Amino acid sequence: MVTDNSKATDNSANPNMTQHAVLRELGHKFAGKFTEQFTFDGIPTIWVSRQDLLDVLMYLRTLPKPYVMLLDLSAMDERLRQHRDGLPASDFTVFYHLMSLERNSDIRVKVALSEDDLKVPTATKIWPNANWYEREVWDMFGIVFDGHPHLTRILLPKYWEGHPLRKEYHARATEFTPYFLNNAKQQFEQENLRFVPEEWGMKRSGRDEDFMFLNLGPNHPSAHGAFRLVLQLDGEEVIDCIPDIGYHHRGAEKMAERQTWHSYIPYTDRIDYLGGVMNELPYVMAVEQLAGITVPERAQTIRVMMSEFFRITNNLLYFGTFIQDAGGMTPVFYMFTDRQKAYDVIEAVTGYRMHPAWFRIGGTAADLPRGWQRLVREFLDWMPQRLDEYVKAAMENSVLKGRTQNVAQYDAKQALAWGVTGAGLRATGVEFDLRKARPYMGYENYDFEIPVGYNGDAYDRCMVKIEEIRQSLRIIRQCMDNMPSGPYKADHPLAVPPPKNRTLNDIETLINHFISVSWGPVMPAGEASMMVEATKGINSYYITSDRSTMSYRTRIRTPTFAHLQQMPSVINGSLVSDLIIYLASIDIVMADTDR
């Protein structure tokens, strides 16, 4: 029997919730003005009225040890949700995920909206990075944010009809009329790409001369991804820039609503397509949290080892292309050789290279193959010396230092305000890594360091990523030397089939097994989330189950969405040549940004 755990309570009914200090503080300031909700992830979650929203958000932003980062902002269409006993009445819900580094804690604030009044005040005056998140919510749900400076579509073309994450919006291509592209439609599409400065409040001329508007992109996916930067230039100086994203948007969150909990795993690989199993980890961990599955120690160690291999392959590509964008052509070819050696190990273990879809709910798809230690050891013996050579040849080169030091510089306060995580945050001196701050998958058992920089410039961001490779090598060696015995998958009915003898002798077990395999397992109703320190920063999955074989709502928070939004605040006033270095330093993959 599955029970519904997604229930709201008053402020005193749930001791597990009231133990959070922030809820006690809110109770003193806003007594009787919020309702608590239980979630499987343990993050304190409250519902507030639309009238109190900005007051609550501002209080959380300014209290001692404040919630300085708006980690995520999104919404959910609740009109078809059945298992929501005790929650405030809501057709649509907007939620704000806030993070405090000083407290090392989060809080989730929700606002209930009725279908006939989909308006909520903008939070852009509290957190500047609310801008893009609110545009995405309007794009996907049609919720209006009063006072937003430029509420337009962001992932979809401006002529798009409808809001795809509403429940009445079709989820399959076969439910739409066939798409075709004739000459008239092609001209229409191209005309809609024309940039009109006045639509963005930009002037065409200054006091003495006209400004030049330059389309940088859309680029080929191999050149940092399919996106466009519209630059307002005065000579070589960037007056303003507008990142134009969405070219790689594929509706990843909508797809989750039509896939079983298991069959959605391959789709996660295509988010950050350089991250491999690192993409799968937060998703399967969130489902395991929802289902109450404990992953065996061996499976945890295997997951850590393979995740760190993909961190290395990602950072090697980043390192090579960073040097290439700065003018050095040779190193990237050497680093592709090193990546190939890492992929040899990955392919031997998972059967695939970049998109293995190898993690499973409860563990992994298979155990480690015979001879895996030899392959891992060979790579561990090979890589450190190569890395030393690259640093000496490239990062200690005076020309590269001149191109990258004190370029695209920002401090910790700016990084936190814009939701920057990963190497971009640590390069400003903030020693925050989820593997240390909030260990998962047994990371608390590994001996490794958190690389940090202090200048917050392009050079420091690259040096942090290089040192991450060294720390990943340390972690992998510890995995190899201390690989525990035992199963590679949890013995749980939602993760593995029942024993063969039971299916042969018990008809009910056989029927349940048939339904589970053909339709997919049914997960308990409720909400769960998991975040990991991915290759580019914090990647999280926030899933809602309505006691079904499919997710009711899957929210994917990706790091590069926040990192690209910060770009104008960093690069305006700099030169175009500095912009190229900045792009190289932030490690973007547009499938990660656009989802």
Curated annotation (Swiss-Prot):
Catalytic reactions on record: a quinone + NADH + 5 H(+)(in) = a quinol + NAD(+) + 4 H(+)(out)
Record carries keyword S-adenosyl-L-methionine: no
Cellular location(s): Cell inner membrane
UniProt-annotated stretches for the region NADH dehydrogenase I subunit C: 1-186
GO molecular function, one term: NADH dehydrogenase (ubiquinone) activity
EC number: 7.1.1.-
Superkingdom of origin: Bacteria
GO CC terms: NADH dehydrogenase complex; plasma membrane
Spans annotated as NADH dehydrogenase I subunit D: 210-595
Entry keyword set: Cell inner membrane, Cell membrane, Membrane, Multifunctional enzyme, NAD, Quinone, Translocase, Transport, Ubiquinone
Membrane association type: Peripheral membrane protein
Keyword Protein biosynthesis appears in the UniProt entry: no
Class of enzymatic activity (EC top level): translocase
Predominant cellular place of this UniProt entry's protein: membrane
Disulfide bonds, paired cysteine numbers: none
Task of the protein: NDH-1 shuttles electrons from NADH, via FMN and iron-sulfur (Fe-S) centers, to quinones in the respiratory chain. The immediate electron acceptor for the enzyme in this species is believed to be ubiquinone. Couples the redox reaction to proton translocation (for every two electrons transferred, four hydrogen ions are translocated across the cytoplasmic membrane), and thus conserves the redox energy in a proton gradient.
Subunit structure as annotated in this protein's UniProt entry: NDH-1 is composed of 13 different subunits. Subunits NuoB, CD, E, F, and G constitute the peripheral sector of the complex.
Family that this chain belongs to: In the N-terminal section; belongs to the complex I 30 kDa subunit family.
NCBIfam families listed in its UniProt record: NuoC_fam (TIGR01961), NuoD (TIGR01962), PRK06075.1 (NF004739), PRK11742.1 (NF008728)
Protein name according to UniProt: NADH-quinone oxidoreductase subunit C/D
Organism encoding this protein: Psychrobacter sp. (strain PRwf-1)
